[in-house]
From Swiss-Prot:
The lineage of its organism: Bacteria, Pseudomonadati, Pseudomonadota, Alphaproteobacteria, Hyphomicrobiales. This is Elongation factor P. Belongs to the elongation factor P family. The gene is efp. One of its GO terms (biological process) is peptide biosynthetic process. GO terms for molecular function: translation elongation factor activity. InterPro entries: Elong-fact-P_C (IPR015365), NA-bd_OB-fold (IPR012340), Rib_uL2_dom2 (IPR014722), Transl_elong_fac_P/YeiP (IPR020599), Transl_elong_KOW-like (IPR013185), Transl_elong_P/YeiP_cen (IPR001059), Transl_elong_P/YeiP_CS (IPR013852), Transl_elongation_fac_P (IPR011768). PROSITE patterns: EFP (PS01275). Keywords: Cytoplasm, Elongation factor, Protein biosynthesis. One of its GO terms (cellular component) is cytoplasm. HAMAP family: EF_P (MF_00141).
Amino acid sequence: MKVIASTLRKGNVVDKDGKLYVILTAENIHPGKGTPVTQLDMRRITDGVKISERYRTTEQVERAFVEDRDHTFLYQDGEGYHFMNPENYEQLAVPEDVVGDAAPYLQEGMVVTLSTHNGVPLAIELPQRVTLEIVETEPVTKGQTASSSYKPAILSNGVKTSVPPHITTGTRVVIMTADGAYVERAKD
């Protein structure tokens, strides 16, 4: 379907010259003089080539139909990451480059939103927060109170983060998947 270029956002998929591109960044630029434009940084889905395009904000762009469905993460092997559609129990192997930075946060049984176009996986969206265990951090020093100073820690998935001084090794914590930031101690 055709849409105005200024309405495109990150994560949308556009059809340009018969090839599909996923939008990495979309910025509307209004110069003091001249016509406003929309600057799009895109990645070709088939081979990962990145391109940058400028469109007049009123120009029509072909937006591809993308289906977003919840899938359950099962396991990872040489073929990629395997997900199951809970409605019809169909399994889908997603390549490593599509999973990208989300890979360390995937846990068996986790429900994610999988975006597909004609059955081809394009992107996955994780839950905003995940609960993980601290496997390594500095010991608690007596007299330290809950202050604004943070100490480095390594999570059970290998990601490094910063946690408050009262958190010890073995503690389960809630982490933001977007940036790996500590939110709170897990309530379980």
